[in-house]
Amino acid sequence: MGVFMTERADLVFHNKVIDGTAMKRLISRLIDHFGMGYTSHILDQSKILGFQQATATSISLGIDDLLTIPSKEWLVQDTEQQRFILEKHYHYANVHAVEKLRQSIEIWYATSEYLRQEMNPNFRMTDPSNPVHLMSFSGARGNASQVHQLVGMRGLMSDPQGQMIDLPIQSNLREGLSLTEYIISCYGARKGVVDTAVRTSDAGYLTRRLVEVVQHIIVRRTDCGTIRSISVSPRKGMTEKIFVQTLIGRVLADDIYMGLRCIAVRKQEIGIGLANRLITFRARPIYIRTPFTCRSTSWICQLCYGRSPTHGDLVELGEAVGIIASQSIGEPGTQLTLRTFHTGGVFTGGTAEHVRAPSSGKIKFNEDLVHRTRTRHGHPAFLCSIGLYVTLEGRDIIHNLNIPPKGLILVQNGQYVESEQLIAEIRAGAFTLNFKERVRKHIYSESEGEMHWSTNVYHAPEYPYGNIHLLLKTSHLWILAGASRRSSIVSFSLHKDQDQMNVHSFSVEERYIYIFDLSMTNHRVKHKLLDTSGKKDREILEYSISDRIISNGHWNLISPSILQDNLDFLAKRRRNRFIIPLQYDQEREKELIPCFDISIEIPINGILRGNSILAYFDDPVYRRSSSGITKYGTLEVDSIVKKEDLIEYRGTKEFNQIQIKVDRFFFIPEEVHILPGSSSIMVRNNSLIGVHTRLTLNTRSKIGGLVRVERKKKSIELKIFSGNIHFPGETDKISRHSGILIPPGTGKKNFNQSKKELKNWIYVQRITPTKKKYFVSVRPVVTYEIADGINLATLFPQDLLQEKDNVQLRVVNYILYGNGKSIRGIYHTSSQLVRTCLVLNWDQEQNDSIEEVHTSFIEVRANDLIRDFIRIDLIKSTISYTGKRNDTGSSGLIPDNGLNSTNINPFYSKSKIQSLTQDQETIGMGTLLNRNKECQSLIILSSSNCSQIGPFNGSKYKNVTKESENIIPIMDFLGSLGTIVPKIANFYSSYHLITHNQILLKRFLLLDNSKQTFQVLKYGLIDENSRIYSPDPCSNIILNPFRLNWCFLRHNYCEETSTIISLGQFFCENICLFKYGPNINIKKSGQIIIVHVDSLVIRSAKPYLVTLGATVHGHYGKILYEGDRLVTFIYERSRSGDITQGLPKVEQVLEVRSIDSISMNLEKRVNSWNECISRILGRPWGFMIGSELTIAQSRISLVNRIQKVYRSQGVQIHNRHIEIIVRQVTSRVLVSEDGMSNVFSPGELIGLLRAERAGRALDEAICYRAILLGITRASLNTQSFISEASFQETTRVLAKAALRGRIDWLKGLKENVVLGGIIPVGTGFQKLVHRSRQDKNIHLEIKKNNLFDLEMRDILLHHRELFCSCIQDNLYETSEQSFTNS
């Protein structure tokens, strides 16, 4: 009491209400001043006082005491309003799903936290004596979080995968939950209904598997006699408390000295006193015995196991420690979380620092040092590439704010900001990167339809044969509405007579090749769909004649339109041409040209210049399969050589104006063999041979004649000239000439001393074998007459040739090979000598020169039939090059000049020019493919999928005209995608205008009421970047950018601003159509498919925003069903510790399914150890030591990983339990070679100790390597087949055991239980092992082991200098790996 009086002056007098925190502080000070005994007396007095007062006041808890916070209602309303705006942004595709989720979570989290903070002040002001308030905030019972759920709102919950559900529970427990909120709350908490049920079943199955692995592990001996041990020392980050727990209950494997004094001896059990002494003295690494060091895998000894956790003494003999270990690990699994609770970026304070404006003013910064980006919520922002100063100019003061690199500026340059407005966000430093994880989020289609994207994509390299594409930039993905092909009747027709249906441009990556089989009877066409983009095994889908679709009562035959190869083939093999095969037509049987051999030849980029080849026809008459020489340069008449002008080779694809007439040309056949240089030739040079003469061992001649042999560097060229040999006299004129053609009817002088008339052309060639001697070869000649050009009327229908335009078409025949050019017909190839070409040209006006034209294929519906046209758009190149041109020719796949056919030698024969009537600017070229079919499509639109906007007739608005001398680029892209929805204005494009009488082409369409324009109907796909895509779902073709948005301006360079509606353009919902004029909004997102004079028809579409790096599942134009996977986003989110936590993490490690697989590291270590040690010690020692060291490292790594998971959840498990499990998982090795086929077979799993004993006993080494088995696999690889069969795969296990003749020694618990025997534990233990025999075995084994150990030590000491550094380095690396991985 005297002490109390002396220190009373130091104590502070408290006269206030104290809560739980203040009570803790008071108790702490009482203990410091008075000690434990006196403090407990004081606390007892306060407890009694509290009970007395509570009894007197009779405070009780009732449901009426739970008062909801008044501000909750308007807070939730405000949050709902924000969420509604967010939903609208998502609906308009301004943000994507991940950004929406993040933002939604943050909004609700902020609301919930605000309500939590409001709770205490609200109680204090309204009802300070509220029992709930008194109970929770005094610290008596309950915490703020629990009371918040009672009177505030439950807030956000997680789904079973650990993702936050963005639909919060707005109600509190006082108000009651709705059915949806109740189900979400069942998932939500750690003690939730669903969580508990699933966790119990998972933990139960884990326990069962663990029991299967270690049920036979029993303490059978006191000491196994091992000298092995494991060194333990406090690891980095390990607390002293955990290290003490690791030591207590273990047995020392070696003596411990402090200087010369021994403080602990071998085989001594470590208690709490010894453990504290070891830590205090900081003893060197302590060597202890663990289950890893025990000499047998089928049992364990007392000293290796250590203290029993039940009674605090050494474990008793006969105790089933394996069962205890498996239950110790499995049972706490019900306390572990099944998942990690992620907030999806809720706690922004930890990851980013906000910068707010100190006062109101104007923001200024250097725009050159920033670039546009998006925040993680989808808001527009500027990313600072380097450190940047932002100036805030207020009325009286100027503030300079420093934004570090990678900071985000959230306001625009020159924007006025209010005080405390958020202007920038500074990202956290590099140390937070370790706490992030990359997560995938899959987005599924909400409706059925056709997929289109509006940017370039590239094929994912890891899926070479799949349909997965990666996005190169932020853009929109559209799902165009439409029912699937399963619908049989089309209820709504969009296209009227002579409407344009489709546009095919020429930047095509065609995924299907259509094969026409014209050999079928009755001229039925069988169509095969051949997939070229898939794997090597191509799948052919056949559509029979009966496979039809009913459309408006007309039969629909699925027939393909254009034969187009894959893009690679187009560039290399097809020489940039598109082939349109024509169907067989009975009416054209008698015509000279079979129509199905005509091919269209158009460059990939679709641009043709003047005098370009548009189409060609290879006449089979001019096709030769044999070798020979073409001649048309010199002719001889009446033995007088007349040399006509030779036609020079012009290396250009354009036709020159001067044409030289060649009526005929000649082909001189010959047989050519190109043989390897080492071939042995059986004929002599300049000798005459007959037909079928053997030339080499494997080659015979097809014709007889003169043999010419010419040796080259690496080959031998052997030619055989058919014909006669003539030895001329002195008077022969012909001897002076070599290589001349003689026409028929010429006198043949001195040939065989007679004079005859020649019936056919012959070719005379002088051959000089020696300087003095020579002779003449007279060879037969094949003569080809070149026919006149084909009349255009045979190619194109008459009605279309009557159109007025200024385009000229002429048919030109030209020879593909030059004069004297040799043609090699080797390996059964044929050569085309003459090609008939359709040459395109147009009239050039003086003031209006057009240099090039754009070509495209279109489909036009006419009288319920589809007609295919080639559309040619004349382009004025003087204006159009001012804007940015993105021609696909520069993409690297196709050369810019399109038709770069180097093997075409333009020798022109007769040309027949047919001028078509002039006046207009276009040509409507008729069908090359005249198909009789109704409009068919696999996507069927109904009236519910389309909406009409208009009419616009009553609207009056003015056009804004601005005079300018310079050329003004028309395209105007506004900001980054997702910030401002771009105004749909200033889009110029080419339009096809169709009326019922003529086919015309205009360059643009102005939706202007003052200019009553024309009926425009075009069906194509043009995205917001004005790229045209083919909507033909049969072919699934993707069309890369084929730009039609040329910057057309008037001649006076006057820019006229009007609303330009592009056909095929995509609109987001709620966009105003007209900038100046009537307020007409689009009510639905979609694509314009029909433009009338006074209205539009829009096909409904659902837009999705996708960002850079997102993965798109499916090809362009793919038909998706509701619920199909559409996009996968990869994003980062905060994590705590591990990506996978709780029970799945434990299972992942025990089944060896880790992401950074331990087994991979294990394999590398084994190989490195085997290499080093086998080289020095030989194979048996090398394999043994390598496997031992590797397994030891892996065991420690596994134990640390599992303990880390349990400790993170607050569950304490002793290491020895985990060690028993891990020992069984790592106790097997895999026989890798057939070293001793009569002992072990390759691939057999054997115990490590058994392999070591066999290796020492046998002369030959057994090659094996360490392997990690998962617990399931380890359960099926035990010594008892009865135990294995009772776990899984009963039939397979028993059949295998019968075939191998396995014996089960019934040493475990389970097999004895199955057979009804006494289990060998507890009282039944002594029946299995006799004590006397056991002691005897122990003595012998200790002796043997020590001898072996001494031998090993001698070997290692002897070779220490040789390989010590190698082993230490490798051991250091592997141990570092194991500890860092753990």
Swiss-Prot record:
Q: Molecular function terms in GO for this entry?
A: DNA binding; DNA-directed RNA polymerase activity; zinc ion binding
InterPro entries per the UniProt record, alphabetical? DNA-dir_RpoC2_beta_pp, RNA_pol_beta''_euk, RNA_pol_Rpb1_3_sf, RNA_pol_Rpb1_4, RNA_pol_Rpb1_5, Rpb1_funnel_sf
Question: What reaction does this catalyse?
Answer: RNA(n) + a ribonucleoside 5'-triphosphate = RNA(n+1) + diphosphate
Q: Does the keyword Cytoplasm apply?
A: no
The note describing how and how many cofactors are bound reads: Binds 1 Zn(2+) ion per subunit.
| Alphabetical list of Gene3D superfamilies matching this protein | 1.10.132.30, 1.10.150.390, 1.10.1790.20, RNA polymerase Rpb1, domain 3
Report quaternary structure and partners.
In plastids the minimal PEP RNA polymerase catalytic core is composed of four subunits: alpha, beta, beta', and beta''. When a (nuclear-encoded) sigma factor is associated with the core the holoenzyme is formed, which can initiate transcription.
Which family is annotated? Answer: Belongs to the RNA polymerase beta' chain family. RpoC2 subfamily.
NCBIfam families per record: rpoC2_cyan
As for what it does, the entry says:
DNA-dependent RNA polymerase catalyzes the transcription of DNA into RNA using the four ribonucleoside triphosphates as substrates.
**Record-given protein name:** DNA-directed RNA polymerase subunit beta''
Kindly list the organism's lineage.
Eukaryota, Viridiplantae, Streptophyta, Embryophyta, Tracheophyta
